[in-house]
Amino acid sequence: MHKRGENFGLNFNKLPAFTEVFKHMACLTLYHYDRSTAAQRVRLLLEEKALPWKSVVVDTARGDVAQLPDDYHRLNPKGLVPVIINDGAGIAESLVILEYLEDAFPEPSLRPPSPQARANMRLWMRKIDDGVHVASRTIGVCLVNRHIYKAKSAEKIEKYYAQMRDQVRRTNDQVNIASGLDSPLLPDALATFRRLFEEMDLTLSESPWLAGETYSLADIALVVYVRRMASFMMAPLWHDLKHLNEWYERIAGRPAYESAVVSWGDVTEQDRKEHGQAAFPQVARLWKSES
């Protein structure tokens, strides 16, 4: 029988890796909101690793800055989410956060074992900063968000623009809110996603995961965009990409996905469905024109 004070021969003072991980596990605070794709992938990694974390919801998409700490813009000059705080230190940018958490809490590992597979993982993740994330926002604003923003007063829209510190994001939003489905930026954004999904499908025809045989940060980083496009009722556009769809279902069936993504919901879900369905015929024509 285990008696008080017994440690079964283990000297925890000689387990610095264990004690360091245990010490930091309770110190994670995530600034995020429900439907942010960048925040979704960070939550997904936190749940896959079963790390305890404190939630601070800040809906920056709606101009909610009341809960941001005074030095938030020092942590992320763009003023966006997510930002994660660990033991007093702040880390911004979701892809950097994924790599940081993998370094800080390496078990269970979400990097493939071989150097080649790890390189492939990072090449997939690089696509996000090379255009996928900007394209995702363009599609979302053109299809759905423009209706939400245009319902506001001119004064509130100007205030919204004034709060945006990312010049590219502000300029794109101004074009996309004004032009909607006729935005000159929409065709290229849809083409970016069509190429991405087709490339993913081809890769997944040869391996179960994007970086090979191992579920990795690449899968976590990119799955949120399939969900985002599907939230606009656009899934029929890639119904023939069998391997992509099977991959998505495998991830969606993981307990971590339920707790990190599904359970947080989306306060704009109904708007996405209604405006997405209305936009589908024109979007489908643009999607096909890029074939």
Predicted regions span which residues?
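C-terminal or late-domain output modules
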Residues: 32, 40, 64, 211, ...
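Alpha-helical and His/Cys-centered functional microenvironments
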Residues: 6, 36, 232
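GST-like fold's C-terminal all-alpha helical module
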Residues: 132-249, 253
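A short, terminal or domain-edge coil/loop segment
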Residues: 109-120, 141, 163-177, 259-276
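Cationic, amphipathic, low-complexity segments that mediate targeting or membrane/lipid association
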Residues: 1-13
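Short flexible/disordered coil segments
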Residues: 121-124, 147-152, 200-204, 268-287
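GST-like domain detector, emphasizing the conserved glutathione-binding G-site
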Residues: 11-167, 287-291
